[in-house]
Amino acid sequence: MHIRFTKMQGAGNDFVVLDETQGRLGLTPAQYRFLADRHFGVGADQILTVRPSPGAGIDFEYVIHNADGGQVEQCGNGARCFARYVRDKGLTAQDTIRVQTMAGVIAPHLTADGRVTVDMGRPELEPARVPFDTTGLAPVSQGSGQKWPLALDGQASEATLLVAVVSMGNPHAVQLVDDVDTAPVAQTGPLIESHPRFPQRVNAGYLQIVNRGEVRLRVYERGAGETLACGTGACAAVVAGIRLGLLDARVQVHTRGGLLTIDWAGGLQDPVFMTGPATTVFEGEIDIPDAL
């Protein structure tokens, strides 16, 4: 199969974007994995697909596949690239669009300075809805938030972490660290991601508080490993920090790929807003093997 694609990145989180507004490509999980492969394919953290409106009041459908070929609910950095793509390709003339995802409707807005702000919707803090299994666990309360003990099997020390659990349409476990540069992301990230208390697996966030308006963050993403940035991870980390009484309503999030701005008023019904860059890297064509 011969297809056209666009390579994009948002704060270093990189994507292959596919246009299915004129018809479905019908790719298999193995073909998505091929596209994401950095040696044999194009290379990307996720594959983003643009599909036509699925219903009234919606402009587009936004479909996300991780590098492992699995479909996921949400990707914040990808949402910014999605909005930039449909505008640059002439698929819309609107500055604000309404986009259907597996997790619900989001509303990216292209700002005058070239960045994109995305209304990421309301965070979910009820553990069962993240989902996170709290059976037999007692939370540690801090501020208006909670941290939950998470025992990591297979660690020499049988370490127990304290994590705040948040869903931004996809599940996140956020832990506070003194220094993200020395955090054991490669060692504990896979253990947290596949921990049995997270039945849908989880994105593991490592959050360093610099001050009440500035943090540093690394994320080991479910199905992708550590990425240079994770938009929903930044949202979840800031929500956790605000609930724990550590952060103000606007926070600058330094990722390894760039800077994101997260705004949240702090109420359970308040949406989280994420602002950051979205850049086209190159356009291309590729032959995808039919049998993989």
UniProtKB/Swiss-Prot annotation:
Keyword Isomerase: yes
Coiled coil ranges: none
Chloroplast recorded as keyword: no
Disulfide bond annotation, renumbered to this chain: none
The protein's Enzyme Commission number: 5.1.1.7
Any one Gene Ontology molecular-function term assigned to this protein's record: diaminopimelate epimerase activity
GO biological process, one term: lysine biosynthetic process via diaminopimelate
Compartmental location: Cytoplasm
GO cellular component, one term: cytosol
Alphabetical UniProt keywords: Amino-acid biosynthesis, Cytoplasm, Isomerase, Lysine biosynthesis
Residues at the active site: C75, C230
Record-listed substrate binding positions: N13, Q46, N66, G76, N77, N170, N203, E221, R222, G231, T232
Enzymatic reactions: (2S,6S)-2,6-diaminopimelate = meso-2,6-diaminopimelate
Family, similarity comment: Belongs to the diaminopimelate epimerase family.
Name of the protein described by the UniProt record: Diaminopimelate epimerase
Gene symbol of the encoding locus: dapF
